[in-house]
């Protein structure tokens, strides 16, 4: 964020209406299937071979110059072409050669003599022999031009809704340990399968965690240690272009969503997966990914539990309020760029910097698939540079595709979403999209004050277990095992002592009765004053009280208006005369972070009970302050707010932050 000192002037005619964590890895067939989705399975030829009977072309007339197909040899290329969802990847090509892509129409077009055709898109093959074309129209046939001397036959790319036949997934077998799941374009994703017992004792209710972190790391810790004691099979899957997964990584491009579809279907097809359906779990990144995957409507997806999520990548996280989020979003993105770097050189030597450590360990131990899957990593885009180059929302750059609020209406499975308004990583805007989940009538919400991990705190954990038991395991919920796990979870994340979970609410009920009772409850639960429960230490992640509502926004909510007064007052009527107030905008006048030095070394410390804060009030004259008279009755602010301001600044750019407090 660029910091400027300047004089900001606010008109008093203003109206207020109130109604992840990502850390770097080393820190801790069938005939109905679309044949275009199959990558070559044999070694490619090492030289370009002319096609025996190339398509006939007419000689150009005198008024035109030859087309590309007139003038270039049509060949079978000496590399692997893998058409994917709106993509074409090239592997095994000669490093340094040039590859361009043109539409078949462009390739066949004869231009008037002297005219210049539009230059094809493309570039130079990288040192790994790879190149990737993105954002291709699936309704168009494409051809590759190699070194300006030869051209391929037409290539069909896959549309977003061209899903494989179920037989494609049924033919894949996954066993406990590290596996590779094949996607519709031939890319393989690394997956770690952990079962709660012997495979012959299955089937087991199954959950999938899917992200660009390290869920497929067999030696990592995380949700696999949480769900297997609860009786669930756990499958952690690395997104393409991360860890040991093949392909190239770009933040939530659509192929990651269809990869999620393929992952769900492949896992659900396993004989050890209960009822051949799976649920999805995850907080933050693997929570957000559930929204992207569920929009594709995988037939075997039972339910999702997206916790600590965003409603819009740009407005909630990258540029909240139009201000670049250098505190979290830029660093998080840089971590993803670094994690997505190749683990090995083109000749197979381990690269010390970048990449994911567990992938390097796997390659060193002889995992040849992991090694081969590093080949497209140099095609990962420079995401941080794109952020700085895109300070404004532009739907033509696919920002709409990165906005869950625009597609959550497509989600048609039971959904349980939870999060906190003061989430320091993903922000507090996600409740603004809750009324957009119109595709499912099994929709449950837990809202609370607090930070990023509050959603999996002990206050919400029992409801999470109940939801998964009812909609994935399809059994009467019990918290017996959860009572053992919850204190360990709370201690590790929040630094708490012993915490007791409530009694089983559905004890003695048949499954159908428990499900009916759960569905009869209000769907929205708000945990008030989290961290201030009576009889507990300060900041213990428990609420003082809980209220339930039928929907969000709360139907009985009444919008409240407050007006700035001439004398620094805040009242329910507008001032009769206009005036203004001035302050010196001095961003450097307060600390860049509100953590004390002893708590600033580890980002996880912010969630602990003993966190030390260093919150400082703005110095006199560096903020405009307005205050109400003492309220005559208790008022609860619930929902979104807005501030209408008329601003004049002595500098070209100034940031504004509006805080409502008591």
List where the protein language model places each region:
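Extracellular mucin-like PTS domains
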Residues: 31-58
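C-terminal, loop-rich substrate-recognition/catalytic regions characterized by aromatic stacking residues
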Residues: 458-662
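Cap/lid segment of the alpha/beta-hydrolase catalytic domain
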Residues: 189, 198-269, 620
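Accessory cap/linker subdomain of secreted extracellular hydrolases
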Residues: 292-411, 479, 499-504, 509-521
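Bacterial signal peptide processing site
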Residues: 21-24
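N-terminal cap/lid segment of alpha/beta-hydrolase-fold proteins
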Residues: 159-202, 627, 631-633
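A catalytic-pocket lid/entrance helix-loop region that shapes and gates access to the active site
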Residues: 255, 266, 281, 285-358, ...
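C-terminal motif of bacterial Sec signal peptides marking the signal peptidase cleavage site
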Residues: 16-19
């Amino acid at each position: 964020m660029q910091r400027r000192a300047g004089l900001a002037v606010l008109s008093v005619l203003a109206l207020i209406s109130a109604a992840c964590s990502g850390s770097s890895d080393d820190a801790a067939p069938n005939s109905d299937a679309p044949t275009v989705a199959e990558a070559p399975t044999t070694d490619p030829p090492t030289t370009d071979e002319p096609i025996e009977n190339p398509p006939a072309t007419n000689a150009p007339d005198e008024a035109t110059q030859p087309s590309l197909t007139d003038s270039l040899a049509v060949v079978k290329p000496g590399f692997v072409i893998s058409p994917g969802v709106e993509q074409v990847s090239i592997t095994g090509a000669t490093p340094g050669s040039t590859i361009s892509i043109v539409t078949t129409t462009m390739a066949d077009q004869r231009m008037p003599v002297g005219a210049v055709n539009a230059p094809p898109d493309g570039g130079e093959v990288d040192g790994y022999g790879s190149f990737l074309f993105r954002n291709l129209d699936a309704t168009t046939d494409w051809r590759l031009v190699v070194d300006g001397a030869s051209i391929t036959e037409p290539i069909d790319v896959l549309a977003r809704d061209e899903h494989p036949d179920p037989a494609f997934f049924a033919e894949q077998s996954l066993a406990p340990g590290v596996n590779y799941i094949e996607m519709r374009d031939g890319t393989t994703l690394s997956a770690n399968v952990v079962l709660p017992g012997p495979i012959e004792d299955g089937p087991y209710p199954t959950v999938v965690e899917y992200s660009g972190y390290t869920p497929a790391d067999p030696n990592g810790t995380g949700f696999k240690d949480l769900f297997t004691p609860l009786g669930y099979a756990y499958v952690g899957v690395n997104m393409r272009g991360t860890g040991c997964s093949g392909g190239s990584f770009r933040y939530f491009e659509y192929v990651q969503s269809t990869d999620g579809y393929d992952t769900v279907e492949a896992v659900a097809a396993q004989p050890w997966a209960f009822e051949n359906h799976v649920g999805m779990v995850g907080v933050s990144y693997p929570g957000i990914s559930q929204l992207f995957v569920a929009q594709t409507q995988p037939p075997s997806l039972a339910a999702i539990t997206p916790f600590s999520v965003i409603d819009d990548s740009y407005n909630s996280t990258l540029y909240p309020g139009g201000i670049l989020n250098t505190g979290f979003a830029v660093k998080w993105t840089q971590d993803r760029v670094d994690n997505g770097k190749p683990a090995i050189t083109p000749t197979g030597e381990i690269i010390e910097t970048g990449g994911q450590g567990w992938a390097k360990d796997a390659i060193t131990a002889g995992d040849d698939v992991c090694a081969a899957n590093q080949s497209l990593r140099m095609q990962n885009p420079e995401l941080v540079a794109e952020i700085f180059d895109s300070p404004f929302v532009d739907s033509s750059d696919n920002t709409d595709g990165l906005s869950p609020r625009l597609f959550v209406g497509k989600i048609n499975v039971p959904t349980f979403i939870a999060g906190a308004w003061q989430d320091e990583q993903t922000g507090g805007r996600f409740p603004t999209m809750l009324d957009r989940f119109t595709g499912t009538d099994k929709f449950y919400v837990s809202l609370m004050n607090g930070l990023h991990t509050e959603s999996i705190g002990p206050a919400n954990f029992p409801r999470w277990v109940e939801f998964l038991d009812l909609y994935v395991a399809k059994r009467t919920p019990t918290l017996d095992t959860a009572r053992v796990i919850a204190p360990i979870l709370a201690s590790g994340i929040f630094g708490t002592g012993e915490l007791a979970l409530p009694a089983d609410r559905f004890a003695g009920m048949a499954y159908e009765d428990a499900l009916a009772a759960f569905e009869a409850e209000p769907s929205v639960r708000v945990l008030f004053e989290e961290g201030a429960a009576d009889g507990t230490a300060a900041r213990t992640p428990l609420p003082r009280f809980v209220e339930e509502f039928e929907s969000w926004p709360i139907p009985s909510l009444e919008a409240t208006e407050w007006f700035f007064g001439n004398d620094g007052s805040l009242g329910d009527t507008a001032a009769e005369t206009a005036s203004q107030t001035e302050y010196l905008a001095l961003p450097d006048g307060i600390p860049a972070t509100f953590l004390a030095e002893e708590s600033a070394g580890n980002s996880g410390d912010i969630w602990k009970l003993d966190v030390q804060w260093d919150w400082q009030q703005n110095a006199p004259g560096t903020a405009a302050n307005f205050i109400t008279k003492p309220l005559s009755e208790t008022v609860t602010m619930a929902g979104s707010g807005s501030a209408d301001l008329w601003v004049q600044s002595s500098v070209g750019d100034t940031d504004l932050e509006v805080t409502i407090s008591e």
